């Protein structure tokens, strides 16, 4: 393993990935924890990777390619009618083998970036702090920055219309031409295998669900290119070469240093310098803040509305020039921060102005002074969460609780545990809300849905069921989060959960978005 790593460090430009796929000793990589993990050190269960898919399974598939020529038979049968029982087994084989290839390719293409990531942390001496990975850590930082900004822009990063665009982005990082051709061939055949089940508009969506590891690698490389289009004008227009932007680009761009950008980026820089030579003066705004999660980004500025429109115009043009497909300008919304609430990471964030009148007295003269202070507020998006609950069949669209029929076959303790876990996760994730009334409503819907599910199981009404077992049956797991909060806060601070509607608590152990929030 050490010899292989030294070989990779010695010469990264050599085409090692594609031969590595068929090398006998390479399958030991599947058992190496240093290269098996994802680029962001997330555990396997976080992204929902299938533990059954590994290079060991890929090895078996490669052996079958040579022995029984399965791959050619599957490709030849891809255009035939799969509803015939004779070809049903071949279609099942193609689906399983496509996942094996996807998992194996994802592990292989992550190797150079994983090594580069580890060497970057060692060179920069950056500690691997888990607190910095928390989603909640974004809000305290944003609170101090957004108080002094004027405009905010919501940016929706679209999915590429063709999977070939994702492979094309890798050309500037991976010089292994056979691997890129193999990846294109695999994506093309994968589309043919599933063409009778899915439409072209949903092909990327289905691919992202069935091949999570490979898709997220390709999608992250695509998003990093999108962020490069945002960072570059900011770097060129800033008065000083801020180190934070260099660190940002290195972190999000798989740690490719700015002075060592690939040839494709150098071409873009030359074009952009000629394009922005007469207009870069209008982008000189030292107060630009950018944050992104998945496909949504927020860009805030202290500049005027005209400045934000110029950013939008140039970003759209760079996007269309670089990715060669149309970008709808309506995906970027520009609003004044004081009159707008933007949805991000499961919260509705806004900037409120509080007016305060202060009486000042100087000697015998007194006068009144009006002051205006800004306050960053985050609230629970009740409408969005109710929509997620209705999709999951916990309530109606209007928020009326209903029973969960598919859980009625479970035991009473299992039903209560599942509903209780959902309530605790929501309370944990939305603990930073300024107003808890919306969270109480969501918990009430889940509580009554749990009671209706139990009553449905016992073929009784909710009132009769609660009267027989007592209303305290559902109290324990709904108040567990409040008991934890009372232990966390200092004893000297009086704290009552139901009375502290504006108490905000940010946790530093949340590394993924809540499932209900993610589907809202």
Curated annotation (Swiss-Prot):
Keyword set includes Plastid: yes
Q: InterPro entries annotated for this entry?
A: Domain_X, Maturase_MatK, Maturase_MatK_N
- A cellular component annotation (GO) from this entry: chloroplast
UniProt-recorded Gene Ontology molecular function terms: RNA binding
The record's section on Pfam families has:
Intron_maturas2, MatK_N
Q: What are the entry keywords? A: Chloroplast, mRNA processing, Plastid, RNA-binding, tRNA processing
Query: Where in or outside the cell is it found?
Result: Plastid, Chloroplast
Gene Ontology biological process terms from the UniProt entry: mRNA processing; RNA splicing; tRNA processing
Would I find Cell division among this entry's keywords?
Answer: no
Question: What is the role of this chain?
Answer: Usually encoded in the trnK tRNA gene intron. Probably assists in splicing its own and other chloroplast group II introns.
The record's family statement is: Belongs to the intron maturase 2 family. MatK subfamily.
Q: Would you tell me the protein name for this molecule?
A: Maturase K
């Amino acid at each position: 393993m050490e010899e292989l790593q030294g070989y990779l460090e010695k010469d990264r430009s050599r085409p090692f990935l594609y031969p590595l796929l068929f090398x006998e000793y390479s399958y030991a990589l599947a058992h190496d924890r240093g290269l098996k993990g994802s680029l962001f050190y997330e555990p396997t269960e976080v992204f929902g990777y299938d533990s059954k898919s590994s290079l060991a399974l890929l090895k078996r598939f490669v052996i079958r390619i040579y022995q029984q020529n399965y791959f050619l038979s599957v490709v030849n049968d891809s255009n035939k009618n799969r509803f015939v029982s004779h070809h049903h087994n071949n279609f099942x084989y193609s689906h399983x083998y496509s996942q094996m290839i996807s998992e194996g390719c994802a592990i292989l293409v992550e190797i150079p970036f994983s090594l580069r990531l580890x060497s970057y942390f060692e060179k920069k001496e950056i500690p691997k702090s888990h607190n910095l990975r928390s989603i909640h850590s974004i809000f305290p930082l944003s609170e101090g920055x957004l108080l002094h900004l004027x405009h905010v822009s919501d940016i929706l990063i679209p999915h590429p219309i063709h999977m070939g665009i994702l492979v094309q982005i890798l050309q500037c990082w991976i010089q292994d031409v056979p691997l890129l051709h193999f990846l294109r061939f695999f994506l093309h055949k994968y589309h043919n295998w599933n063409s009778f089940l899915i439409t072209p508009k949903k092909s990327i969506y289905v691919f992202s669900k069935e091949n999570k590891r490979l898709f997220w690698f390709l999608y992250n490389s695509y998003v990093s290119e999108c962020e490069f289009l945002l960072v570059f004008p900011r770097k060129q227009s800033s008065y000083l070469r801020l180190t934070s932007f260099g660190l940002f680009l290195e972190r999000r761009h798989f740690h490719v240093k700015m002075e060592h950008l690939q040839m494709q980026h150098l071409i873009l820089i030359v074009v952009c310098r000629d394009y922005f030579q007469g207009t870069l003066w209008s982008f000189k705004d030292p107060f630009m803040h950018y944050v992104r999660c998945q496909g949504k980004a927020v860009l805030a500025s202290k500049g005027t509305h005209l400045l934000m429109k110029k950013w939008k115009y140039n970003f759209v043009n760079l996007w269309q020039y670089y990715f060669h497909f149309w970008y709808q300008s309506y995906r970027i919304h520009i609003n004044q921060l004081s009159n707008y609430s933007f949805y991000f990471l499961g919260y509705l964030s806004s900037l409120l102005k509080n007016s305060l009148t202060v009486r000042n007295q100087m000697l015998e003269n007194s006068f009144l002074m009006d002051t205006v202070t800004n306050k960053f507020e985050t609230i629970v998006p009740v409408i969005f969460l109710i929509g997620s609950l209705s999709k999951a069949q916990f309530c109606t669209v209007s928020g009326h609780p209903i029973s969960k029929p598919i859980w009625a076959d479970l035991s009473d303790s299992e039903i209560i545990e599942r509903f209780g876990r959902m309530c605790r996760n929501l309370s944990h994730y939305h603990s930073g809300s300024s107003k808890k009334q919306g969270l109480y409503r969501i918990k009430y819907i889940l509580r009554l849905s749990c009671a209706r599910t139990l009553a449905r199981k016992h073929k009784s009404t909710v009132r009769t069921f609660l009267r027989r077992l007592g209303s305290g049956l559902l109290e324990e797991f709904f108040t567990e989060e409040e008991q934890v909060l009372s232990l966390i806060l200092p004893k000297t601070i009086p704290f009552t959960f139901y009375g502290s509607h504006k108490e905000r608590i940010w946790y530093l152990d949340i590394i993924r978005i809540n499932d209900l929030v993610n589907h809202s």
